[in-house]
Regions:
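Actinobacteria-biased recognition of intrinsically disordered, low-complexity terminal regions
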Residues: 1-50, 228-247
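Hydrophobic, aromatic-enriched alpha-helical segments typical of multi-pass transmembrane helices
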Residues: 41-73, 79, 83, 87-230
């Protein structure tokens, strides 16, 4: 009597068997079909524009504002806040410039998605502090506590920002690497200490120190945006070339 062969359940897939997506991907890669690499997140052109406008409008504002002041005003000794203060002539020029700078900083922080979220939030806080400086004009008797609070907040957030921008990923521009951002932070901290000392001592170079510190610190978001935009473009172009060759 012939015995029917029993089916081998271990070798016969059932209807409940399914292929896991990660296993399928691994099999495709092993078979010579590599998974398409993820494209780098680009920096939009409008973010580069807002990052450029912030330092450009800041410098233009204090140059035009200083030109409208009487001969007694000295940009070497007196701060930018005097231009937007109640004692300044045509103070609307510097006030409008500060409003534009703050808005550009907020827009840059919102659109610079190539950096981590804490760095974006801190740049937005810097913009809000700049708006606060414009909203609290300095009286003729000197800066108010609210004005000083916004000014100090702007200095602190600007010094800390490079730390949050730093990246450990390979093939990154030096300026956004850990060592590059640490160097920038040390420079910003040194300039800020110089500014605080000049403000405390009431030296004759307070205006010059403030302008130098503000201009250098306002340029860094533009440098970061340009570096990340260029890196993302090169990486995406290289990945497209790899996909074309493997396809």
């Amino acid at each position: 009597m012939t015995q029917l062969a029993r089916p081998d359940l271990a070798r016969c897939p059932s209807g409940r068997d399914h292929v896991r997506p990660d296993c399928a991907t691994s099999e495709l890669v092993a078979a010579g079909h590599p998974e398409r690499p993820r494209a780098a997140r680009p920096v939009p052109g409008w973010v580069v524009s807002t990052a450029f406008l912030a330092p450009a409008v800041l410098v233009a504002g204090w140059l035009i504002g200083a030109a409208l002041q009487p001969a007694s005003y000295s940009p070497m000794r007196e701060t930018v806040s005097v231009l937007a203060g109640y004692s300044g002539t045509d103070r609307w020029v510097m006030t409008a410039a500060l409003l534009v700078v703050g808005a550009c900083q907020i827009a840059t922080g919102a659109g610079l998605t190539a950096v981590r979220l804490p760095a974006r939030v801190l740049l937005i806080l810097t913009g809000l502090s700049t708006l606060g400086i414009a909203a609290t004009p300095e009286p003729a008797t000197g800066p108010t506590s609210r004005h000083l609070a916004f000014a100090v907040s702007c200095v602190v957030t600007t010094v800390v920002w490079p730390v949050l921008v730093a990246r450990r990923a390979p093939a990154q521009p030096w300026i956004v690497s850990v060592y590059g951002c640490a160097t920038v932070t040390v420079i910003f901290a040194g300039l800020s200490c110089w500014l605080l000392i000049a403000a405390r001592d009431g030296g004759g170079d307070l205006g010059m120190v403030e302008r130098l510190t503000s201009a250098v610190q306002a340029l860094f978001p533009l440098v970061v945006a340009l570096a990340l935009r260029q890196t993302a473009g090169r990486r995406n172009q290289r990945q497209r070339g790899q996909v074309t060759l493997t396809g």
